[in-house]
UniProtKB/Swiss-Prot annotation:
This is Chromosome transmission fidelity protein 18 homolog. InterPro entries: AAA+_ATPase, ATPase_AAA_core, CTF18-RFC_complex, P-loop_NTPase, RFC_lid. Its main location: nucleus. The lineage of its organism: Eukaryota, Metazoa, Chordata, Craniata, Vertebrata. Keywords: ATP-binding, Cell cycle, DNA replication, DNA-binding, Nucleotide-binding, Nucleus, Phosphoprotein. It holds the Pfam family AAA.
Length: 975
């Protein structure tokens, strides 16, 4: 050992202290130089080393010679080598080469996994701690039998320091072990050995340490394990491809069987070997196939089926079955309810009347299209498909949101309802289902309406619908008459594009699914898929998804794909699968703001005990939330999902003062008004300066109202109308001001702006327009009263004001100021000043009209007067008698100014007949007979026409049609 320790002088101290015992064992194993009896060399050319000794011996060729082992070796080591040489049979072990020096380089290249070993002992530890290798007798006792050939063959390689003492102070190199720590803190290592008496253990015991199963494994995984893993992956890949192929063949076969299957035949249940659920959605797999499997409302199902059956006469040629007469009691009751005053018919009664109504002249229903409306996920599309197949149609589905072009929309509708493809699979007529019709533009809806409004023949034969005999060229150009039913599906029936369609459609409101029926269906799905779920848990899932069938089934499939075979309430609360971003109604948002939630009605999706579900909008931090915090987040989410913030704020403003206020000092009202002002400031800043990042704060206004005014009482909420009324009144006031300003004289308008009139002048002007006048004739007025009346008339004409007579709903006549500037400057709640009497207003109105005519005649006289010597018009009074050319003519009358072009054609005076020389021709008149009255009539008409030119009364005939009350009036009565 001394020579051996001298040769290790170049090795680090920590390595020597850690592997001292192992290095000594390796040196003793390499020291056996006894030649093998067979004389076969240890290694063969070209063969890689397989054992630890071969790896050490292979390094001899490349290493330099080292001095032999020291003579002072222990006698125990020599005796061990002699026993090992005696135990080896002939030809079992090859002759090892002569040892030159310890192969430290080979030892360094080996992975002893030092990170798993204990810290090396201190250098001054006693060498007696090293456990010597076991003797051959110990090996024989260990295996329970004498030295056999196989045991002798493996004796040298299986020698281990733990053979004599299984408890080691250092981890073994070539064995699997476990470490144990005593109560005093001493670490010990135990070697793992298999049971030698068990079948198949000896082979594994011989090969595992040396074939990659022990600590000398370079890859970490044996080659056999790698091969087995690769084979398993290849086998799994082949199984998946075979499963896909079988699923494809199964789907094709099921489609053919469904097409060839007669109506109402039961479907075959899939076998257990077909794991179709792992490759398809459960929503499609468990979708209803028959009428009896539907979960929707029975009344809705029957109404849609009855409407489809109304097409049987046109599509199938089947006569409509006659209805059985109802008992005599029920019609009397219905008629009594219908004839009751103020009794409105229910929606069900209206639908029944529409279905019982007769057909149109073309033997089609009066409503050519059915419109299903309701929230998403309730099964509207499934209902349309099942009902159409149940009625004997082949369903053709199109999505209106995808085909938004009007031409494409028309082509798809005509191809499904009028072309040769009206016969679908199996010779069945088509039924067109248009999904998401609320997403179609107005132009596409107009195309659908034009197809629905095409008129057919008015005469129908007894054998069925009559075929147009002639004149069908224009109808064929339009596309022909609609002879197939169309079912439209929408989520929002109040979309602007559906206003015209709803008036002609058979409207069906899709109610929510009953929770009991939905829970039963979900339990059937979970049982068939091997998933355990309690009915209470499924009810919680239905409540979380608002009874959405699609969301519930998709949530179950998602949890099942994650390996959950048992569903609990905590899983339902923690998951967010199935939640949809759906816009809430305005009334539901206002109800959420003004009413406190019930204690037992706890939202499933907002459990405060879950750290990942404290808020629907984000993950949030862990911790519990109080009830006030939950209400805060719930109202905030409802306000953010409403989508119409202005309408929400208007509803809050119109309804918060109608609630039961608990604050007698109205402090909550003041705080609410401050929040409303803050919301207006945010909206103005966001839209005027385009600071749209401020729009994240307005949803907090409903939260503040909830904190201030929420109570347990059910609020009476009305739709907001104050904003619309204020806008209408504002536009009315602007029109009044514009009308007033446009009628003011230019001299007055130049000194009065609209704002100055509204704020300063109009209030005082109303006092000026209400003088104290006696309700008597103007001839009885004094000079002062006449001047006051003339000033009043002049002021009203300057501001274009007058009094108009109107009739009130009671039948009384009043005079109202026009334009009514009193509405601009006086509030309706304030007491009005003492108004003028009816006679006074009538007198003022008459004087205003007379003054208007006087001014109009004066202006017309000035305009029509001729110019004298180039002097401006209006100076004829000054220059009337001056000059030879000055001619003074009387001003034309009022009717002459308006009908001047007519007066030119009329004869003013009867001119005497003259001859060629200008002499008046005198004709002799014959005496008329007694019965001849025609000349007298002619003379009367001639005199009448002559008098028309001199008369002050004119009339004008207006062509057209009038429904007014008329009476015969002769011209002679006017003259």
């Amino acid at each position: 050992m001394e020579d051996y320790e001298q040769e290790l002088c170049g090795v680090e101290d920590d390595f020597h202290n850690q592997f001292a015992a192992e290095l000594e064992v390796l040196a003793e194993l390499e020291g056996a130089s006894t030649p093998s009896p067979s004389g076969v060399p240890l290694f063969t050319a070209g063969r890689p080393p397989r054992t630890f000794e071969e790896a050490l011996a292979r390094g001899d060729a490349a290493s330099s010679p080292a001095p032999a082992a020291s003579v002072g070796s222990s006698q125990g080591g020599a005796r061990k080598r002699q026993v090992d040489a005696d135990l080896q049979p002939a030809g079992s072990l090859p002759h090892a080469p002569r040892i030159k020096r310890p192969r430290l380089q080979v030892v360094k290249r080996l992975n002893f996994r030092s990170e798993e070993m204990e810290e090396p002992p201190p250098p001054d530890s006693s060498p007696t701690d090293i456990t010597p290798p076991p003797s051959p007798e110990d090996l024989a006792e260990l295996w329970g039998h004498g030295v056999s050939e196989a045991a002798a063959d493996v004796g040298l390689t299986r020698a281990s320091p733990a053979a004599r003492n299984p408890v080691l102070r250092r981890p073994p190199i070539l064995e699997d072990y476990v470490h144990v720590t005593s109560t005093e803190g001493v670490r010990a290592y135990l070697v793992l050995r298999a049971d030698p008496m068990a079948p198949g253990v000896q082979g594994s015991l011989l090969h595992v340490p040396w074939r990659g199963g022990g600590q000398l494994d370079l890859l970490g995984v044996s080659l056999a394990s790698l091969k087995k893993q690769v084979d398993g992956e290849r086998r799994e890949r082949l199984l998946q491809e075979a499963q896909k192929l079988s699923d494809t063949l199964h789907s094709l076969r099921s489609g053919e069987e469904e097409a060839a299957q007669p109506l109402g035949a039961p479907e075959e249940e899939p076998t257990d070997g077909q794991d179709a659920s792992s490759h398809c959605l459960w929503v499609d797999e468990f979708a209803p196939r028959h009428y009896t499997e539907l979960l929707s409302d029975d009344f809705t199902n029957r109404c849609l089926l009855k409407w489809l059956k109304l097409w049987d006469l046109v599509v199938f040629g089947h006569e409509r079955p006659s209805r059985k007469p109802r008992p005599s009691v029920e019609p009397a009751r219905v008629s009594k309810e219908a004839t009751a005053p103020g009794k409105w018919k229910s929606h069900e009664q209206v639908l029944e009347e529409m279905l019982e109504a007769g057909l149109d002249p073309s033997q089609r229903p009066k409503q050519k299209v059915a419109l299903l409306c309701g929230p998403p996920g309730l099964g509207k599309t499934t209902l349309a498909h099942v009902i159409a197949r149940h009625a004997g149609y082949s369903v053709v589905e199109m999505n209106a949101s995808d085909d938004r072009s009007p031409e494409v929309f028309r082509t798809r509708i005509e191809a499904a309802t009028q072309m040769e493809s009206v016969l679908g699979a199996g010779g069945k007529p088509n039924c067109l289902v248009i999904d998401e019709i609320d997403g179609a533009p107005v132009a596409a809806i107009n195309v659908l309406l034009s197809i629905l409004n095409r008129k057919g023949p008015q005469e129908v034969g007894p054998q069925g619908p009559a075929v147009p005999s002639g004149g069908g060229r224009r109808r064929r150009a339009e596309g022909g008459l609609l002879m197939r039913p169309i079912i439209c599906i929408c989520n929002d029936q109040f979309a602007p594009s559906l206003r015209q369609l709803k008036q002609q459609a058979f409207l069906l409101h899709f109610p929510p699914t009953l929770p009991s029926r939905l829970v039963q269906r979900l339990q059937e799905v979970s049982l068939r898929q091997g998933m355990r779920a309690d009915p209470g848990v499924l009810a919680a899932l239905c409540e979380k998804t608002d009874n959405d069938i699609r969301a519930c089934i998709n949530t179950l499939q998602f949890l099942y794909s994650r390996g959950q075979r048992e569903l609990s309430v905590r899983d339902v609360q923690a998951t967010r699968v199935g939640l949809k971003d759906q816009r809430r109604g305005l009334f539901s948002v206002w109800q959420e703001v003004f009413q406190l939630p019930r204690a037992q009605r706890r939202r499933v999706g907002q459990d405060p005990a879950l750290p990942a579900d404290t808020l629907l909008l984000g993950d949030g931090d862990a911790g519990s939330l109080t009830s006030a915090s939950q209400r805060f987040y719930r109202v905030l989410h409802a306000a953010a999902s409403a989508g119409e913030h202005e309408k929400v704020v208007q509803g809050l403003f119109d309804n918060f003062l109608r609630l039961r206020l608990r604050d007698s000092s109205l402090g909550a009202v003041c705080v609410a008004l401050d929040w409303l002002a803050f919301d207006d400031l945010l909206a103005g800043a966001a839209h005027h300066s385009q600071s749209f990042q401020l729009l994240r704060y307005p949803p907090f206004l409903p939260v503040a109202f909830h904190v201030l005014f929420a109570s347990s009482h059910t609020p009476r909420i009305t739709f907001p109308s104050s904003q619309q009324e204020a806008q209408n009144r504002m536009s009315q006031m602007r029109n009044l001001i514009q009308t007033l300003v446009s009628g003011i004289a230019p001299a007055t308008r130049s000194r009065a702006t609209p704002q100055a009139l509204l704020l300063d002048a109009l209030c005082l002007l109303l006092d000026i327009l209400a003088p104290k006048l006696r309700p008597v004739s103007t001839q009885l007025y004094s000079t002062r009263e006449k001047q006051q009346l003339a000033s009043l008339v002049g002021t009203m004409l300057a501001y274009s004001l007058t009094y108009r007579q109107e009739r009130t709903p009671d039948g009384q006549y009043i005079y109202r100021l026009e334009p009514n500037v009193e509405e601009l400057c006086r509030f309706p709640e304030l007491p009005a000043r003492k108004p003028l009497t009816y006679q006074t207003k009538q007198l003022i109105a008459r004087e205003i009209e007379v003054e208007k005519m006087r001014r109009a005649e004066a202006s017309a006289r000035v305009e029509n007067s001729p110019q004298v010597d180039g002097s401006p018009p209006g100076l004829e009074g000054l220059l009337g008698g001056i000059g030879e050319k000055g001619v003074h003519r009387p001003a034309p009358r009022n009717h002459e100014q308006r009908l001047e072009h007519i007066m030119r054609r009329a004869a003013r005076e009867e001119q005497p007949e003259k001859d060629f020389f200008g002499r008046v021709v005198v004709r002799s008149t014959a005496v008329p007979s007694a019965g001849d009255t025609a000349p007298e009539q002619d003379s009367v008409e001639r005199r009448m026409g002559t008098a028309v030119g001199r008369s002050e009364v004119w009339f004008r005939f207006n062509e057209g049609v009038s429904n007014a009350v008329r009476r015969s009036l002769y011209i002679r009565d006017l003259l």
